[in-house]
């Protein structure tokens, strides 16, 4: 896969433009080894590699591609799939995943690879063809995401679970940057572990309400206001919260559409109150998004770019086309 990506990118980038690739990995089995292998292949193909050493999130990898002006990026992960799986997510220079025609172009190159070239990882580091950039990117990523925080109460007690994934490298520092100081990492899910041992069915999908059973029990015990979880590569979120303000309230795990509707309304409301909502702003929805979000956007006079195919890459494409 790495060789095919390298071959395709080289065919698309002008000869006088330096080649660069950002690489990160999650907590799955052999993710470290696969990321090093990808780095060796990319260096041998003539790319400078910006390598995030240590478990990092998919959003941070996407950020690194743009921050380092890379030609492409590689995230070694299988998202919230079972423990037996691992794979790569490929990113274009925009920081988004591959869109047509590039996605098919890379697949065609992968299928036609007959030779895989590698440069020894340690040798490439010594020759500065691989640069460890995690400290710099961590700082810039956390600051950039923290600036997106909207006004509102910060006196919340949050129980957070990375579901044995990378989330503590992204969620916790971003929450702290945004002013949320009472955050407890749920101990049962805190350890990075590709077996996802303490998650129901060993599948770390925060959209599965069963994931929250033990979290909610603990959250109620410590009188938390909300329980939040992210998948292994930290690009998917779920949450559970009490139905009322009563101390003995039942808790409910929100669906993706419920979370999306609440976030859309909150962001639009706070931007309107700040006087920063304009006709240039828009909401993006996909084929599986509730129509409630379109109605919320309409109520604020904001257009909706809707019914995109499912996947972050299509949303990123809309941002590139219409502006953020």
What are these regions, as identified by a protein language model?
Residues 53, 111-136, 243-324:
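Proline/glycine-rich low-complexity loops and linkers
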Residues 37-45, 68-69, 89-97, 173-181, ...:
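A glycine- and small-aliphatic-rich helix-loop capping segment at beta-alpha/alpha-beta transitions
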Residues 14-85, 179-238:
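N-terminal small/polar loop signature for handling phosphorylated ligands or for N-terminal nucleophile
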Residues 74, 79, 86-107, 237-269:
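Glycine-rich phosphate-binding loop of actin/hexokinase-like ATP-binding domains
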Residues 86-219:
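Gly/Ser/Thr-enriched, mixed-charge loops and adjacent short helices
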């Amino acid at each position: 896969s790495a060789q095919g990506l390298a071959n395709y990118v080289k065919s698309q980038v002008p000869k006088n433009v330096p080649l660069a690739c950002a690489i990160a990995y999650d907590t799955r089995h052999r993710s470290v080894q696969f990321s090093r292998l990808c780095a060796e292949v990319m260096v041998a193909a003539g790319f400078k590699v910006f390598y995030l050493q240590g478990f990092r999130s998919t959003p941070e990898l996407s950020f690194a591609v743009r921050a380092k002006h890379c030609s492409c990026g590689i995230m070694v992960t299988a998202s919230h799939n079972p423990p037996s799986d691992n794979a790569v997510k490929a990113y274009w220079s925009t920081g988004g995943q591959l869109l047509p025609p590039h996605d098919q172009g890379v697949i065609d190159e992968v299928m036609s690879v007959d030779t895989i070239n590698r440069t020894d990882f340690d040798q490439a580091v010594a020759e500065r063809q691989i640069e460890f950039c995690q400290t710099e990117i961590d700082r810039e990523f956390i600051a950039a995401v923290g600036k997106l925080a909207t006004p509102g109460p910060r006196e919340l007690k949050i129980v957070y679970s990375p579901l044995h994934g990378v989330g503590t490298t992204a969620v916790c520092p971003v929450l702290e940057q945004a002013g949320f100081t009472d955050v407890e990492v749920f101990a049962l899910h805190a350890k990075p572990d590709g077996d996802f041992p303490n998650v129901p069915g060993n599948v770390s999908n925060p959209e599965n309400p069963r994931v929250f059973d033990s979290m909610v029990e603990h959250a109620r015990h410590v009188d938390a206001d909300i329980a939040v979880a992210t998948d292994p590569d930290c690009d998917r979120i779920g949450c559970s919260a009490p139905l009322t303000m009563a101390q003995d309230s039942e808790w409910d795990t929100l669906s993706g559409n419920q979370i999306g509707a609440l976030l859309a309304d909150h962001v639009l409301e706070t931007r309107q109150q700040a006087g920063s909502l304009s006709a240039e702003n828009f909401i993006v929805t996909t084929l599986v998004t509730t129509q409630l979000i379109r109605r919320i956007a309409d109520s604020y006079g904001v257009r909706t770019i809707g019914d995109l195919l499912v996947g972050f890459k299509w949303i990123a494409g809309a941002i590139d086309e219409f502006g953020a």
